[in-house]
């Protein structure tokens, strides 16, 4: 045969192969979407995978495939990731933090979404006109009531430098949960006779500048609220607060391990585990009957021994050292 004919034949075969439809995986595929890289938030994925494994689904057994993508804080990349998983399509989406969950809800109405480290559907503003959550949204969520307990601890364990306690915080104006938390804390601060100074921070790149500006206002304490930007910028925040001897309080137990004084809040690993239990139930039955977004179940009162000693804090009852 003429060599050119061999070449044309090879090209023809390749074209035929390229035109064939994608072969659906014989095992269920989970598309796990993380909005950004963070040491604390990453515990949710570990918990989610552990729950699947405890229910019999693991990549070691080759009876499930977990595709992981991280947007590294970039919204266009996050959208591309979700669109890619939908086009595959994956059997279910696991979304970690608010941005991932909202993006997934906006992009698909059919693929089941199991959210974690995210607020209630109402706080994400994804309810329909009749007040119902998306029919394909499940997983574990949280509201903001626990923040009251966390913030109210501050005046019980810390004395003001001057006459009135001054607490500083930063928040992300573009993140509904963060903005809602700031408003809630502001109302609570008024009731507790605390002066709250809140500054917007919409990108971790500005963390140094905004934190220093806050510290220049002579605050007594810093409150780290549930905010993706706070998580991503925490080491910068802590470094600046340490230099000014300003203790950090929080509602997020994972941040205590990273240097906050104490917290009453959800265990991030268990939050992911709870969402994973729902996902496993769906994978077993291929039905969503009885599933819905449910409140996170496990919260912890934890403290950082090193920070408690540094700031001479007298602990409230029922707090345990962070592990």
Residue ranges, per PLM feature:
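Short hydrophobic alpha-helices and adjacent helix-cap/hinge residues
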Residues: 2-8, 19-323
